[in-house]
């Protein structure tokens, strides 16, 4: 049975997360575009590489749901929507719309936002995304030709393009460990939040995230979270 099925919004990101999964001990196969055959033998994870980062939101949703259908046919235990660690998107999407569509299809009312990749200088603190110690909106991403990032606060970025409230699990909670992090996520869900941004300043934070999230149907983020889940 397939343990993790990754739906990646571009080829480079797909290759990135596939390498992280393999390096952390999970046999992984990367497939370009929505698969048509059966699951390759001998793998615990499949990474589906799409081209949905900057296409129209409805097309991104269509392709992502098609990938999800295939993953479900393979008995996939957990779906991982992978996007860039700089949260490349606009108020129109595509991170929010695709996340919402996957949540509906998987019948889940809550998921996480975890773009951090500390090894590459992408960290999240108090819900703010940093690139090499600079706030996202003060990095080179501010002048991105397709998806200029002029805000650094991930809950605000997510709420602008999605269908619910977004909270934050701060680094201090992650420092307290798995039980505290799990309890904090549960509280946000009970309070009606639909998404939770997870702080991460180091790999230990990602490991804790992975332990907490190992059995949930859907996670979203960059490649870093794969370290904890593999």
PLM regions and their residue ranges:
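Cap/lid and interdomain-hinge subdomains that line or gate substrate/regulatory clefts
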Residues: 1-2, 60, 68-206
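N-terminal basic/disordered segments at the start of proteins
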Residues: 2-41, 62-64, 114-119
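Short glycine/serine/threonine-rich phosphate/pyrophosphate-binding segments
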Residues: 13-17, 205-206, 228
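Hydrophobic alpha/beta core scaffold segments
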Residues: 14, 28, 66, 72, ...
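Anion (oxyanion) recognition and catalysis
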Residues: 22, 72, 213
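Short, structured active-site "lid" loops
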Residues: 45-64
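Acidic, glycine-rich loop-and-beta core segments that form the ion-binding/anion-interacting portion
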Residues: 213-230
């Amino acid at each position: 049975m397939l343990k993790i099925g990754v739906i990646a919004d571009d080829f480079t990101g797909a290759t990135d997360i596939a390498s992280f999964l393999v390096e952390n001990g999970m046999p992984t196969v990367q497939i370009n575009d929505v698969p048509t055959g059966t699951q390759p033998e001998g793998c615990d994870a499949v990474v589906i590489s799409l081209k949905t980062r900057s296409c129209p939101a409805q097309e991104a949703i269509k392709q992502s749901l098609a990938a999800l259908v295939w993953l479900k046919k393979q008995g996939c235990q957990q779906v991982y929507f992978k996007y860039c660690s700089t949260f490349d998107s606009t108020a129109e999407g595509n991170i929010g719309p695709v996340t919402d569509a996957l949540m509906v299809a998987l019948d889940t009312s809550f998921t996480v936002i975890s773009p951090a990749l500390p090894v590459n200088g992408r960290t999240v603190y108090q819900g703010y995304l940093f690139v090499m110690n600079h706030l996202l909106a003060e990095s080179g991403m501010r002048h991105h030709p397709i998806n200029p990032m002029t805000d650094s606060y991930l809950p605000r970025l997510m709420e602008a393009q999605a269908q619910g409230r977004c909270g934050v699990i701060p680094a201090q909670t992650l420092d307290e460990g798995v039980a505290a992090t799990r309890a904090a996520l549960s509280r946000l869900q009970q309070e009606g939040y639909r998404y939770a941004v997870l702080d991460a300043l180091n790999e230990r934070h990602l490991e804790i995230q992975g332990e907490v999230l190992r059995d949930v149907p859907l996670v979203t983020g960059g490649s870093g979270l794969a370290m904890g889940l593999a």
